[in-house]
């Protein structure tokens, strides 16, 4: 991958370094963003919710409907404490979205885990 800026090619490594200065988690978030977009989902920021993304179901329009998922991205090597897991669940519940945990491995492959509430 190269980026062209005013007809000047910028190597992939340099692009990544520039992006890392803007967002230290870009190597975790970008594979998730790319994967969801390739699957046809609309992906928007969820910064105001303290999450990485909000995702709209295929064919749904942001502004006309609510996002289906709120997404938190992490690397497979990162441990998730019960209090962090609970906090993520509270954010999803309070925003009326399903919680989607996106776990990125060493090869930048993404696994998703959807968390839903069960009424008993």
Enumerate the language-model features and the residues they cover.
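Conserved phosphate-interacting/catalytic interface
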Residues: 1-33, 42, 59-120
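Beta-rich nucleic-acid/ligand-interaction surfaces
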Residues: 50-58
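Short, well-structured beta-strand/strand-turn elements
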Residues: 39-50
């Amino acid at each position: 991958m190269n980026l062209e800026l005013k007809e000047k090619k910028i190597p992939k490594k340099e692009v990544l370094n520039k992006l890392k200065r803007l967002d230290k988690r870009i190597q975790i978030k970008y594979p998730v963003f790319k994967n969801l977009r390739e699957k046809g989902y609309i992906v928007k920021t969820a910064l105001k919710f303290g999450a990485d993304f909000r995702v709209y179901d295929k064919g749904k329009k942001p502004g006309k409907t609510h996002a289906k998922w709120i997404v938190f991205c992490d690397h497979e090597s990162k441990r998730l404490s019960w209090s962090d897991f609970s906090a993520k669940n509270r954010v999803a519940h309070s925003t009326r979205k399903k919680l989607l945990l996106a776990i990125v491995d060493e090869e930048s492959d993404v696994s998703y885990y959807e968390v839903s509430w069960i009424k008993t």
